[in-house]
């Protein structure tokens, strides 16, 4: 809700995104760095973890995170992952049918996903980048991932809508890799009842 105060009601959503994120003086252009610096005592490590996890839609296991970030697989990494989960930047889950040993960490913060996909490392983008690319295949694919993340961030509301708010559940995804004989299949959200 705080960021909505920056929106100009006479502009379209894409125009507002351009004005806030892609304009040279955009109010949210540097928000990613400010956000991590204001929330965490070691913002660079936390950004490294989030950026690592954000590289793959299904996320990574902790040993992979340690390997990619150079942060030792120890209590220090555990504390950082717990802080990111508690802050709702990432979730921890075991893919459907896998053991807890295969626990993964997945990026679910929409702002971080947007920043990593469209801002980080990209310089000299036109100030109307979002307006010009709204119908591109890349943005359409990103919207699908963003919708999945909205669902993951609102499990309690989904459960309420399904009439199972009081039932203990686990959330996960399921992927069947394709091979020479079968196509691959993916289910983005499975809500498994524990009753």
Give, region by region, the residue ranges found by the protein language model:
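Short amphipathic alpha-helical boundary/capping segments
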Residues: 32-42, 64
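A cross-kingdom feature that marks ATP-driven nucleic-acid transaction machinery
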Residues: 96, 103, 108-195
């Amino acid at each position: 809700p705080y960021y909505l105060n920056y929106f100009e009601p006479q502009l379209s959503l894409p125009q507002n995104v351009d004005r806030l994120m892609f304009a040279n003086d955009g109010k949210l252009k540097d928000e990613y760095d400010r956000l991590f610096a204001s929330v965490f005592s070691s913002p660079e490590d936390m950004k490294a973890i989030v950026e690592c996890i954000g590289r793959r839609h299904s996320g990574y296991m902790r040993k992979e995170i340690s390997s990619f970030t150079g942060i030792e697989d120890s209590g220090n990494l555990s504390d950082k992952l717990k802080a990111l989960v508690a802050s709702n930047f990432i979730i921890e889950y075991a893919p459907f049918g896998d053991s807890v040993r295969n626990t993964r960490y997945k990026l679910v913060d929409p702002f971080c996903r947007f920043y990593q996909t469209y801002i980080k490392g990209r310089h000299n983008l036109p100030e109307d980048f979002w307006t010009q690319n709204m119908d591109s295949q890349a943005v359409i694919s990103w919207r699908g991932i963003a919708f999945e993340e909205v669902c993951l961030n609102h499990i309690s509301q989904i459960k309420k809508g399904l009439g199972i708010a009081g039932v203990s559940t686990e959330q996960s995804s399921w992927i069947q890799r394709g091979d020479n004989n079968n196509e691959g299949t993916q289910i983005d959200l499975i809500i498994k009842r524990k009753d």
